[in-house]
Amino acid sequence: MSAKRRLFTSESVTEGHPDKICDQISDAILDAILEKDPNARVACETSVTTGLVLVSGEITTSTYVDIPRIVRDTVREIGYTRAKFGFDADTCAVLTAIDEQSPDIAMGVDQALEAREGQMTDEEIEAIGAGDQGLMFGFACNETEELMPLPISLAHRLSRRLAEVRKTDVLPYLRPDGKTQVTIEYDENGKPVRVDTIVISTQHHPEIEHDQIERDMKEHVIKPIVPAELLDENTKYFINPTGRFVIGGPQGDAGLTGRKIIVDTYGGYARHGGGAFSGKDPTKVDRSAAYAARYVAKNIVAAGLADKCEVQLAYAIGVARPVSISIDTFGTGKVSEDVLIEVVRNNFDLRPAGIIKMLDLRRPIYKQTAAYGHFGRTDVDLPWERTDKAAVLKEQALALAKNE
């Protein structure tokens, strides 16, 4: 590898990974509540360990949902259906410890600071204040069709394929827990040129030989997913590198909601504000503003205004308008970043209520995001992945740039 070339690595995990079990349970509960009560406030955290699921958090709603049933259905759907897997949907204990949202927080969210101070018009009074302070990032680049970095894109597709060959009995000896990792080599212009390394760790039946797992992973998982032109004789493969992965899932490791925030986003390729997504209703800007930031970044790249774009939004609790909007195109912008910020302000309502309305977020759409990434998904229709603003952004940005 020449001195100017570089390697970058991202990882993904399957739906049976302990932390991802928790994300899916939290979002399944959120979806069940939003289906009946779109205005509910939900902050739902899940923890799993051997034989036990604990659901806790703050939920304020007018409806009732059967949390233990949702937990068991989710665990069953993932594939933990037998005690010998170390975790069983029908026999695991389910504990719940649910509170209501703090009235101090609710006060800030229910009526935004600007409205309390009388600074907003009547129609703006409906704007919801941010549920917390914080900063969120959104990112897009033209490395893949879905405008995502290639390492995380391939890692997610490999993880999803692992679950697919297990559930369709192509490889019936696989069990639900698993991880993937992909290292991409970039040339001196920052373009991806080849896959340097692929790591796959998958839980399996104790009687299966390591050599068979290695052969099957290459034939049934890697080959259908990774484009042949990216693989060469120097690509390295590490399949179950410890030699054995029988004990897995919650029996192997405890899991928690919100522990896979880099897997959920851009695989470390872009910055992260630190807030997790799963189990949070859309008044939580950790979630909704991160989705909005991706929506903005993706439309900028789709418009051809930059090859790579990172958007940062920041909020104060109880205040509707973002305290800052920042855009970085890493030297790839076709117009200045000041122009981009202006057209973004003109075309995207980035107040929490504006985001919820723009992306229609008060719907039960979240469980499907809780495994295999929240961004760049081609298998599900997510509103923040649409590029419906690209044309107007391009037109306005180029017009503004002429007047600079």
Swiss-Prot record:
L-methionine binds at E58, Q101, D253, K284. ATP binds at H17, D177, G178, K179, R244, F245, D253, R259, K260, A276, K280. Keywords: ATP-binding, Cytoplasm, Magnesium, Metal-binding, Nucleotide-binding, One-carbon metabolism, Potassium, Transferase. One of its GO terms (cellular component) is cytoplasm. InterPro entries: ADOMET_SYNTHASE_CS, S-AdoMet_synt_C, S-AdoMet_synt_central, S-AdoMet_synt_N, S-AdoMet_synthetase, S-AdoMet_synthetase_sfam. The keyword Transferase applies. Gene3D superfamilies: 3.30.300.10. Its cofactor is Mg(2+); K(+). Mg(2+) binds at D19. GO terms for molecular function: ATP binding; magnesium ion binding; methionine adenosyltransferase activity. CDD domains: S-AdoMet_synt. It is found in: Cytoplasm. NCBIfam families: metK. Catalyzes the formation of S-adenosylmethionine (AdoMet) from methionine and ATP. The overall synthetic reaction is composed of two sequential steps, AdoMet formation and the subsequent tripolyphosphate hydrolysis which occurs prior to release of AdoMet from the enzyme. Homotetramer; dimer of dimers. Belongs to the AdoMet synthase family. This is S-adenosylmethionine synthase. It comes from Geobacillus thermodenitrificans (strain NG80-2). The gene is metK.
